[in-house]
Amino acid sequence: MMAGCGEIDHSINMLPTNRKANESCSNTAPSLTVPECAICLQTCVHPVSLPCKHVFCYLCVKGASWLGKRCALCRQEIPEDFLDKPTLLSPEELKAASRGNGEYAWYYEGRNGWWQYDERTSRELEDAFSKGKKNTEMLIAGFLYVADLENMVQYRRNEHGRRRKIKRDIIDIPKKGVAGLRLDCDANTVNLARESSADGADSVSAQSGASVQPLVSSVRPLTSVDGQLTSPATPSPDASTSLEDSFAHLQLSGDNTAERSHRGEGEEDHESPSSGRVPAPDTSIEETESDASSDSEDVSAVVAQHSLTQQRLLVSNANQTVPDRSDRSGTDRSVAGGGTVSVSVRSRRPDGQCTVTEV
């Protein structure tokens, strides 16, 4: 009998702690022990199973997923929607936790409602509150939080700016869920985008539309010249005209220095309108259409006197060391009655031939 009693006592000690001693062995099935979390190294609170079959606390998986979407043991990827649709080992345990074991429970503020703390955190808060502490620290999802029991707020220890209200209230108030796990299975609420809050809050982040800012173009805008859009690389018509005038002016100046004796040509003395300079009136070189026609009638006289004019030019150039431009410009010295003139004028005909006439 003594041995039998010893065996009976030994079998009772081998039973799980949650099994009553007066329960019959034949009427109960062997129960599974609560697994331990490999992240927090404690007994799992609301254990969830990953696709790789590893089991962790729900909040531990949530905190680890922010650092990397992989299992903490085998490094297998965690599905994107796992936190919204976790695989609970015991859904009944979640409902039992929401009902609570006492009269009061602790809650933290969420969007459009309150969340109930998990059992472990609720015990820590209740213990600090009963002892009259002003604040206490909580480890939630790998982050240290400070619960200010005077102002009834919580915040991260290294980030005091973001605060969340907390409260101690009766267990039967309406709530959204426990520790980020929803009690309802509404598909519309499950798929809401939630912020990365370690305590399981579901504050919906403001989903603003993708704003596309216009890129600052490195190309200069098109400029308008006389109502026409021109590119900065494309020269304007005025610029091309001024360039042509500049080249013409350079060519004329080169011709003037090379052949000072040919300054009698009419077109070389005309200034471009764009140069902005008003030339002195020179009637001897201003050539009109009537002058050109009268010169064509006197072709024979011009040819006869061509040799005489060249001799006179040579004599005048030899006598003058510094030729006067005003004297050589062919100033009009016409004499009434067909008088002779000592200065000859060289004009350009419309056909491009140069003729020398005496006035």
UniProtKB/Swiss-Prot annotation:
SMART domains: RING (SM00184), WWE (SM00678)
GO cellular component: a single term: nucleoplasm
Region span, Disordered: 254-359
Post-translational modification comment from the UniProt entry: Ubiquitinated; autoubiquitinated. Polyubiquitinated in the presence of UBE2D1, UBE2D2 and UBE2D3. Multimonoubiquitinated in the presence of UBE2E1. Not ubiquitinated in the presence of UBE2H, CDC34, UBE2L3, UBE2L6, nor UBE2C. In the absence of PAR, autoubiquitination occurs on Lys-85, Lys-95 and Lys-176 via 'Lys-11' and 'Lys-48' ubiquitin linkages. In the presence of PAR, Lys-131 and Lys-176 are ubiquitinated via 'Lys-6', 'Lys-33' and 'Lys-48' ubiquitin linkages. Autoubiquitination is enhanced upon PAR-binding.
Effect of residue 54 to A: Partially suppression of WNT3A signaling and stabilization of AXIN1, TNKS and TNKS2 with or without WNT3A induction. No effect on TNKS1-binding
Pathways per UniProt: Protein modification; protein ubiquitination
Molecular function terms, GO-annotated: poly-ADP-D-ribose binding; ubiquitin protein ligase activity; ubiquitin-protein transferase activity; zinc ion binding
Protein location: Cytoplasm, Cytosol; Nucleus
Binding site for a glycoprotein: 108, 111, 115, 145, 154, 164, 176
Subunit structure: Can form homooligomers. Interacts with PARsylated AXIN1, AXIN2, BLZF1, CASC3, H1-2, IPO7, LIG3, NCL, PARP1, XRCC1, XRCC5 and XRCC6. Interacts with DDB1, DHX15, IQGAP1, LRPPRC, PARP2, PRKDC, RUVBL2, TNKS1 and TNKS2. Binding often leads to interactor ubiquitination, in the presence of the appropriate E1 and E2 enzymes, and proteasomal degradation.
Miscellaneous comment as given in the Swiss-Prot or TrEMBL entry: Was named dactylidin after the Greek term 'daktylidi' for ring, 'the thing around the finger'. Was named Iduna after the Norse goddess of protection and eternal youth.
Disorder: Defects in RNF146 are a cause of susceptibility to breast cancer.
Name used for this protein in its record: E3 ubiquitin-protein ligase RNF146
Organism: Homo sapiens
